[in-house]
């Protein structure tokens, strides 16, 4: 699997791995890259079956497989210890990495994540699946911003959204791959295993997230032994895109604090 690695800003700089959500594209994290590469070696990638890592995914494709293939690619690139920043599905992959490779994951940041899918989130995905089946890729892509962004943010950026729609259609991961990745997300359940995650965790959520209720992050916080929760008042599901200034400040402060906390504990 292809990875994109930034040059380390200094010798032995910590590594931060960015894992996007269901869309799978590493470019999702563009608003964070400029600030992160000043302090960390940053790894971005298109998830298997998407973007520049095309593949046909098996029907039983799972979050555990997503975690294993990423870890193997990191080790092959000479990276054995790393912090993980995951958004939604990416946060699930991050938790799986922390469970399966505890010696490798130094810190986990969960952005609008959950222990197991909430009934409201499941309902949103059911609607989106119906759109996919009835209207194809175009219907899926055109509906997606409604679940990602606040209404006023979208209304002020109509040309940008049109350009994003065109790009998403041109690079659509395919119906079968999308549904298999979505099914992996829906099957994931960390409610009985989260207390085994021992690395420090920063939980970031947005109070106006239409797709994932903030209660999901509260449940995560209660279940994870060494976690802290930050709530953004605005930003929607893709709060790192809509309010990068606020998000980046939380992320940079959290990473620095938790990495120091981790090193002090060793």
Swiss-Prot record:
InterPro entries: AB_hydrolase_1, AB_hydrolase_fold, AB_hydrolase_sf, Pyrimidine_utilisation_RutD. It comes from the Bacteria. The keyword Hydrolase applies. Its EC number is 3.5.1.-. It is an enzyme of class 3 (hydrolase). One of its GO terms (molecular function) is hydrolase activity, acting on carbon-nitrogen (but not peptide) bonds, in linear amides. GO terms for cellular component: membrane. The keyword Metal-binding does not apply. GO terms for biological process: nitrogen utilization; uracil catabolic process. SUPFAM superfamilies: alpha/beta-Hydrolases (SSF53474). Belongs to the AB hydrolase superfamily. Hydrolase RutD family. Involved in pyrimidine catabolism. May facilitate the hydrolysis of carbamate, a reaction that can also occur spontaneously. This is Putative carbamate hydrolase RutD.
């Amino acid at each position: 699997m292809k990875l994109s690695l930034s040059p380390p800003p200094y010798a032995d700089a910590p590594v931060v791995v960015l894992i996007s959500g269901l869309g799978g594209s590493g470019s999702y994290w563009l608003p964070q890259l400029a600030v992160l590469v000043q302090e960390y070696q940053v790894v971005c990638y298109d998830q298997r079956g998407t973007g520049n890592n095309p593949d046909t995914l098996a029907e039983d494709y799972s979050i555990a497989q997503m975690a294993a293939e990423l870890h193997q690619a990191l080790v092959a690139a000479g990276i054995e210890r790393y912090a993980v920043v995951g958004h939604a599905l990416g946060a699930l992959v991050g938790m799986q990495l922390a469970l399966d490779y505890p010696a490798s994951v130094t810190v986990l940041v969960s952005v609008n994540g959950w222990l197991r899918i909430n009934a409201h989130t499941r309902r949103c995905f059911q609607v989106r699946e119906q759109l996919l089946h009835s209207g194809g890729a175009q219907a899926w892509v055109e509906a997606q911003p409604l679940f990602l962004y606040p209404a006023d943010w979208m209304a002020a950026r109509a040309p940008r959204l049109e350009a994003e729609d065109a790009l998403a259609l041109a690079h659509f991961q395919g119906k079968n791959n999308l549904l298999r990745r979505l099914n992996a997300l829906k099957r994931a359940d960390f409610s009985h295993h989260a207390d085994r995650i021992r690395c420090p965790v920063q939980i970031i959520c947005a109070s106006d997230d239409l797709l994932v209720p903030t209660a999901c992050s509260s449940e995560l916080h209660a279940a994870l032994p060494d976690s802290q929760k930050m709530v953004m008042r605005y930003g929607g599901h893709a709060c790192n895109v809509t309010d990068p200034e606020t998000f980046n400040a939380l992320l940079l402060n959290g990473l620095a604090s938790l990495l120091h906390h981790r090193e002090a504990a060793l």
